[in-house]
Amino acid sequence: TRRWGLLGASVTQHPQFTDLLSWLGQDRFDDVRVSVSSVRAATVTPELASGLANRGSKSLTIAIESGSERMREVVNKKLSNEEIHAAARHAKQGGLKALKLYGMVGLPSEQDDDVESTADLLLQLKQTTPGLRLTLGVSTFVPKAQTPFQWQGVRPEAEKRLKRLAKRLKPKGIDLRPESYGWSVIQALISRSDRRLASVIVAVRGSQESLGGWKKAYRSARSGDLPAAVSAGVDLPLPPPWDAVIHHRWNDSTVLPWDHLNGPLGRTTLLKHQEQALSLTDPGGLD
C-alpha cells in the first residue's frame, strides 16, 4: 500500500482540496492510503471524512488549544464548541474511527475552571459521538520569542492541571497524551535564555541529556563549579536564577535576549496584543 500525506497549515482550506479528494477517489488509487495534517474544525464535513475514510484514513486531528471558549479568545483561536462538536459528528458520519484533539494548559490568565471546561468538552464529545475514539494531546504553554506572550513565564500549576485532566478523562476511556511538564520547563529554559546558557548546554552534552542532567548542569553553572573542560579557560558569566528564567513574568521594559532581532511585529504592537488578550479575564465579558 502506498501512503500519501497531505501537509500544510490548513490543508482542507485549499481552494482545490475538494477536487483533489474527488480525484483521489478514482479506482486507480485503491492501493493508496491518504492522510492529512491537523485540520480546522469548521472544514470537516461528512463528505471530507468519507473521502479520507475511503482512502484508508482512520482519524482526523484538530487543534482546539482549550475547551474553554474564553481561553480560545485569549489566544485568538477562532473556534467555537459547536464547531468542535460538529467536526466530531461529521467525522463519525463519514466513517472515521477516531478524533485527535490538541490543547494546552498553563496559558496566561488560565484558571482551574478553564481546565475543567476542557475535560467537560471531551466528556460531552464522548457522550454525543459514541463509538468515536477520542484522544487529547496536551502540552504546557511555553513562551516563545516575538509573540505577545514572550514576557510570560511557565506556570508551575500547569503540572497539577495535567494531572487533573488525567484524573477526569482516563477513567472514561479517553486517551490522554500529556507532554512531559519537566521537558516543557527545559524548552522554556532554552527559549528564554541568553548567551549565559552556553556553558550549561556544553555541560549537558558531555553528560546525561536528562532532566536531572539539565538541572545539575544549571546548578553547577550558577555556583561556578562547571568542569574546566566545559569553560575551556573562558571566563563564562553565571546564568540567572532558575525561576527568573523559567517562571517569572518579565517586566515590559526588560531587555530581552532577542531584542536585537527584528521580528514581524514590533515591541509596541506585541505589548498591545498582550494587553488585549489579558483583559479577557471575565468569561461574561465575551458575550
Predicted regions: what they are:
Residues T1-T135, S139, P143:
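Conserved SAM/AdoMet-binding glycine-rich loop
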Residues R2-R3, D30-R33, Q93, G131, ...:
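Intrinsically disordered or highly flexible coil/loop and linker segments, enriched in small
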Residues A9, A42, S139-T140, T147, ...:
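Flexible, active-site-adjacent loop/turn segments at secondary-structure boundaries
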Residues P15, E47-L48, R70-V75, V105-D113, ...:
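Flexible glycine/acidic-rich beta-alpha junction loops that bind and position SAM and/or redox cofactors
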Residues N54-K58, Q124-L136, P156-L176, I201, ...:
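Structural recognition of alpha->loop->beta junctions
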Residues Q152-R161, R168, L280, G284-D287:
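Short secondary-structure subsegments characteristic of cysteine-rich extracellular domains
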Residues P171-D287:
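Radical SAM enzyme core and accessory elements
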